[in-house]
A protein has these predicted regions:
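Long, well-ordered amphipathic alpha-helical subdomains in the mid-to-C-terminal portions
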Residues: 198-224
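Short, flexible loop segments at the rims of nucleotide/cofactor-binding pockets, characterized by
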Residues: 41, 70-76, 103-113, 184-186, ...
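Canonical P-loop GTPase G-domain recognition
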Residues: 126-133, 138-197, 206, 235-244, ...
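Conserved G1/Walker A P-loop phosphate-binding module
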Residues: 1-78, 82, 86-87
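C-terminal effector/interaction modules appended to NTPase cores
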Residues: 11, 19-25, 218-430
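Charged, alpha-helix-enriched surfaces in structured cytosolic catalytic cores
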Residues: 22, 26, 41, 45, ...
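Conserved C-terminal guanine-recognition region of P-loop GTPase G domains, centered on the G4
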Residues: 52-60, 79-162, 197, 220-236, ...
Length: 430
């Protein structure tokens, strides 16, 4: 991640759906005013979802997702369509693009008036309650009277769904399409802070950032950057230190430290250094609350005590990165899991968008903080785990639990602390 770029997971995700050669890529280029997507008369130019980071004013930072055609053919085409459908799990706004000139009279009169393939994805969009706009593209190919007739037919069958008529050739209708996107965009100001709601003006927040072989050269990792920015936005003061200098840092600050936020991997060492009077949590736990469901992830950690020999454990990460010899997902967590349970477990890992379709074989899922994932994608993964009856826990919560400091690590969140007492999830007595 660039130090100056908005994280992809925090951008408004706008997915574009339609048949091959409906003009999806042309619409992307016209809306952004840039040649971001390849435009070709050859069907199926877009073979996989293509992600384009972009600023669209006044929405702000967006991620435009150009998906494969809904009418793609063959076994490979079927897999491409499946990938396009999976994009809905992270979508904030959908654009359903039609070539209005190719709609037959029969298609106009059937169902929602937009064609069978389009109606199938439309039903999925509505089922997921994703706001969307119907884009009638290539309007320049029709006479005005015929265009108006078709537009009215589609509007009559689709209730309050915005319907925009555009021509990417003549550059008409684009302002109305942008207005529709602005109207449908989520209010990002209502999004839960990472830590800002826990910070008062002039509060000193101590961040413990280990610099080891896994740390990127010359910069901080994404969750650290984002927490610092959230503290600044709420007029707090960030003090960044490493584990060896933490004690001296706290001594220098005296009673000014409001809280300590650490990399979860250092939970054990940091907990011994930080006085009990200072609240302690981790970047990973903050992101569990920010993008996931903290209560569900805390409840899932107790499954650790029920694991048996031969159980399959999935360790999942939202990003892809080069693995190091002391990688947290493939080395450290499996080691802590084995050390804590004493069981012979089958550990499997996945990263990026490669989250398994079938979760039922797993006895437990241990997921990263999801800093690179869109909030909807992270919550969808948690929901799917719940549907499959598989306990899911976050890296930070798992590490705090096996290190015996779970209660302390969530004391900043009264509802979660109360849950631990109610459910008798108390690592201190074990």
């Amino acid at each position: 991640m660039s130090l100056t770029a908005t994280p992809n997971g925090d951008r408004v995700q706008i997915a574009i759906y339609g048949r091959r050669n409906a003009g999806k890529s042309s619409v992307i280029n016209a809306v952004t005013g840039q040649q971001l997507a390849i435009v070709s008369e050859v069907k199926g130019t877009t073979t996989d979802p293509v992600y384009k980071a972009m600023e669209i004013l006044p929405i702000g930072p967006c991620m435009l997702i150009d998906t494969p055609g809904l009418d793609d053919e063959g076994e490979l085409g079927k897999k491409r369509i499946e990938k396009a459908v999976q994009v809905l799990n992270r979508t904030d706004i959908a654009m359903l693009v039609l070539d209005i000139s190719k709609l037959t009279k029969w298609e106009l009169e059937q169902g929602r008036g937009i064609g069978r393939k389009e109606q199938q994805i439309q039903e999925m969009i509505e089922e997921k309650k994703i706001p969307y706009v119907i884009v009638l593209n290539q309007s320049d190919k029709l006479e005005p009277e015929e265009l108006e007739y078709r537009r009215r037919c589609i509007m009559a069958k689709n209730g309050t769904v915005p319907v925009c008529t555009v021509s990417t050739v003549q550059k008409t209708g684009l302002d109305k399409l942008k207005d529709a996107l602005v109207m449908l965009a989520p209010d990002t100001d209502l999004k839960l802070h990472i830590v800002g709601d826990l910070v008062n003006e002039n509060d000193v927040i101590v961040l413990v950032v280990p610099v080891d072989s896994a740390a990127p050269k010359g910069r901080l990792i994404m969750p650290q950057q984002q927490v610092i920015r959230d503290v600044l936005d709420n007029h707090g003061v960030s003090v960044v230190t490493q584990v060896p200098t933490l004690a001296a840092t706290l001594e220098m600050l005296g009673d000014k430290a409001r809280m300590v936020i650490t990399d979860s991997q250092a939970f054990g060492e940091v907990s011994e250094i930080v006085p009990q009077r200072i609240p302690l949590t981790s970047f990973s736990i903050l992101f569990a609350r920010h993008k996931g469901n903290l209560q569900t992830l805390v409840e899932g950690v107790t499954a650790t005590d029920s694991l048996k020999d031969g159980d399959r454990i999935l360790i999942a990460e939202g990003c892809t990165h080069r693995r190091q010899c002391d990688d947290i997902g493939t080395v450290k967590i499996p080691h802590w899991l084995q050390e804590y349970t004493g069981r012979k477990l089958q550990i499997e890992t996945c990263s990026g968008t490669g989250f398994p379709t079938d979760l039922s074989p797993y006895s437990m899922i241990i997921h990263c903080g999801g800093c690179t994932l869109h909030e909807k994608e992270m919550k969808h993964r948690i929901f799917r785990a719940q549907q499959s009856g598989v306990p899911i826990v976050n890296y930070g919560i798992f590490i705090a639990y096996v290190k015996g400091i779970l209660r302390r690590s969530v004391e900043l969140f009264p509802d979660i602390s109360e849950l631990l007492k109610k459910e008798k999830i108390d690592e201190a007595d074990r």
